[in-house]
C-alpha cells in the first residue's frame, strides 16, 4: 500500500451546477420534522467505483455525472436553492436556481492502493471532499457539495456533503438514483420527486401525545460523562460485526427474544452497553440510546408519497440507569431497545412535530450519556449505478459526535456491518476491550468449532 503522505489530489476550481432548464422561482417551506436544530448539520457520504470498460465504453465519469446532475435538478430544483431564515429562525428554501457546488478532481492512486482508507472513519475524506471556505454553512450556502475524483485505475470516487434539513438518507437516495438513471440515458427519473412538506407540518393546535426521552434533559446527571469531554480529545474508530460476532451475541440473549430480534437491535444493545461501561458513568446516572426509525413503509403507517424526499424519521430513545445496563445480561438492553423502537408510528411522528413547534425546535438533549444510531445498511446507496456498475463501497464515512451510522461492508470473506464510533481517546480503548470481551467466543465453542472443521 502506498504512503498517503505523498497522495496528490488535484482539484479544479469549484463550479455551480444549475438546473438544465428554467425552474420555478419560489419560496418553499420545510416540514416541522425537517426544521429542527439537530438537522442543521452537513452529512458526508462517499461512493467508490471501479473502472468497468464493458459498461461505460470509456466515458468520462465527471462529464457524465455533471450533465446528469444538471438534468436531475430540473426535477429536484429546491436542492439548487438556498436556505433562508425567517421569523423565529424558521427555515424556508429560496428556490433561486443558484446551483449545487461541484468539484472535478484527479488523484494519483488506484482503488486497490487506497484499500480500507476509503472505509469509515475515512482518514482521507478531506482529500476526496474538500471543504471549500464558506461552503459549509447551513444558511445562504449551497445545499450540496459534490466532488468527483478520477483515479489512475479508471475508477472514481464520488463524495458529497448534504445539508440534512433538506433530505434524509432515503430522500438523498431518490436524488442520487435520479442522477444515476439520467447518467445511463434516462430522460426522467423513474420515481418523480414530491415536495409536499406540509404533510409533516405540526397539527393545529399542536399537542404532545407521546413521551419523547430524546428531547428531555435527564435529572441528576454527572458532569464527568461524554457530554463534557474535551472535543479535541475525541477519536474515531470503526468496528466490524460479521457472522462470528453476531453468533456470539445471539447466544447471550434469552430464547423469547431470539425470533423477534433484528441484527440492528442486537448491535445497538451491544454498543450501548459497551459504551456505557467504557465511559465509567456514575451507576445512578440515566443513559440513553436513540434509534433512528424511518417513517416510510408499512410498519409505521405514515402515509407519504413514494417520491417524498424530505426528512421522515424520528429517533425514540431507550433510557436506563447505568448500573442495571452494565450489570445485567445483554437481553436487558435489547428489550429496552426493542420497546423504544416499537413506540414509533404515525402518532409518535406527529407528536414530535408538535413538540418541535411548541418548544422552539430544540436539539436532541445532550445531558448525560447519549448515543444515537442510524441503520444505513438497507438504504440502497450500494445500488446507485452511474453506468460503471455498483460501488465497491457506499455510505456515510464517519460518526458525528453522538451519532453512529451502520453501513454494509463486505470484507474478504463475508458480508457484515461496519460501525464508526466517536469517543474520547481513553474511553475508546476501554470500548474496544469491552466489545472484544462481549463478542469473544467461549473457549468450549472454539474447541467444538475446531473439531467440526477437522472432521
Swiss-Prot record:
One of its GO terms (molecular function) is acyltransferase activity. Repressed by metal ions, zinc ions having the strongest impact, and magnesium, cobalt, nickel, manganese and calcium ions acting as partial inhibitors. Strongly inhibited by p-chloromercuribenzoic acid (PCMB) and, to a lower extent, by dithiothreitol. Keywords: Transferase. Optimum temperature is 20-37 degrees Celsius. Transmembrane segments: none annotated. Pfam families: Transferase. Optimum pH is 7-9. It catalyses: butan-1-ol + acetyl-CoA = butyl acetate + CoA; hexan-1-ol + acetyl-CoA = hexyl acetate + CoA; 2-methylbutan-1-ol + acetyl-CoA = 2-methylbutyl acetate + CoA; hexan-1-ol + butanoyl-CoA = hexyl butanoate + CoA. Highly expressed in the cortex and skin of ripe fruit. Disruption phenotype: Reduction in total esters production but accumulation of precursor alcohols and aldehydes in ripening apple fruits, leading to modified aroma and flavor. Induction: Slightly induced by ethylene. Its EC number is 2.3.1.-. Signal peptide: none annotated. GO terms for biological process: alcohol metabolic process; fruit ripening, climacteric; response to ethylene. The active site is at residues 164, 385. The fruit of cv. Royal Gala exhibits a high ester accumulation, whereas the cv. Granny Smith contains low ester levels; this influences strongly the ripe apple fruit aroma. Involved in the biosynthesis of volatile esters which confer ripe apple fruit flavor. Alcohol acyl transferase that can use a wide range of alcohols as substrate, including 2-methylbutanol, hexanol and ethanol, to produce esters such as butyl butanoate, butyl hexanoate, hexyl butanoate, 2-methylbutyl acetate (2MBA), butyl acetate, hexyl acetate and 2-methylbutyl butanoate (2MBB), and, to some extent, ethyl butanoate and ethyl hexanoate. Belongs to the plant acyltransferase family. This is Alcohol acyl transferase 1 allele RGa. It comes from Malus domestica.
